[in-house]
Amino acid sequence: MQPAKAIAAAPVAMPVPASAPAAAGLPGAVWAELAFFLLFAGFFFYQTLLGLGLIRAYLGGYFAVVSLLLLPPLLLSYVRRLQLRRYQLHRVDAAFLAFLAYFAVVIACNAPSANPAISSHHVLGVLYLFNLFVIFKTLDFQRRRFRLTLLASLAAMSAIVFAFSIDGAFYLAALGAARDPDSVATYQGFSRSYLVPLAVALACTPQRWLRWALYGLGLPTLYINTARSEFGALLFLIPLIEFHAARHKLAMLAVLLALFALLKLNLDAIVAAIPGNRTLELLNLSQSSSASMRHQLTLQALHTIALHPILGDYASYPGGLYAHNILSAWVDLGLFGFAALLVLLLYPMVQMALHAYVLGRRDSRGAAFLLAWSLLGMTALLLCMSHFFSDMLIGAALGAYARYRSGDGHA
């Protein structure tokens, strides 16, 4: 299959002057760092001010407007890097851009007859995927300034969640203080803006004590935010990261299993000690109305796929009522788009697993590997649980993977 062939290996780089990485790295890295904080922490703080009624919705819901404003500098920095490398496109980049191009063609071909709201949503999805890919491929996550700012922003976001939660749940729209309530984000927007920076911080933190402190901060924050999928994703990241970071992996596996058994034995006492909210529905999804709705949407998607197995049936559902999993790609992009997305995600994961756990490659011990490994694993999990095929995390994960495959901190 073409995507698999495209992503298989990095090309042999052309000779580049020694000064080129520095020249290419600084401007792009600065824009990527600015974009990262504007899109995640910036969104969180803007929405907080909006929800508290301290500002009007001057930027609407914020994310789309800011993403559009960031597109020109991110695109220019990406093109500049290609120029410095004599337009030699990395195969990971080529595969991802080919998928985006196919996605864009599908949107354009179906736009005249499709629901405009769905088409607009998908156009923004292409924008978010590209921007996040460039950010995570470009940004230097090891810079001291970046790491300190990241930790400070996580602490500030957690403080906001704890300070404005009511009865164990954080939902600013319920306060009734917003002057433009229709623009206030749901728990999903807040949780995304917290989980992504947290995942970056965890992957790039070598000190185990600091990682566990971040777990201790992140779990209650996402729990109170009532974001079940993101809370589950963090629970998934903990063993994924700690097992990989451990020198003695069998010992760490035993510790993780012991912690799981201890948690299970004391689950009733833990549940009784914490405030109740919808996150607890994870313990019994059969009682969750949201899970029931998602199951029905999945059945609807399977029915559509059975009727249109090759080309799918683009935007054949009411706005927002798409399958909340990777099957949404088959419905909107057809079999080829679905298969391409699977290859884009699964091939890197299989390759990285071989690098780390079979071949024991030295580069699999670095932060670049762990960041890509964490984001790919988390993205795959969320695409199985609740997220749709144009989820921006796909761009972030593949951007981090492209950075790892380049073998250069400023890929």
Predicted regions, residues:
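TM-adjacent membrane-interface loops and short helices in multi-pass inner/ER membrane proteins
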Residues: S286-A323, L333-A340
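Hydrophobic alpha-helical membrane-interfacial segments at the cytosolic entry of transmembrane helices
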Residues: A95-A98, L151-A159, R247-D268
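N-terminal signal-anchor transmembrane segment
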Residues: Q2-R81, Y102-N110, I160-I166, M378, ...
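Aromatic-anchored transmembrane helix interface
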Residues: F63-L68, R91-I107, S113-T138, T149, ...
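Alpha-helical transmembrane segments of multi-pass inner-membrane proteins
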Residues: Q142-L172, A185-H244, Y347
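Hydrophobic transmembrane alpha-helices and their immediate junctions
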Residues: L26, V30, Y87, L335-T379, ...
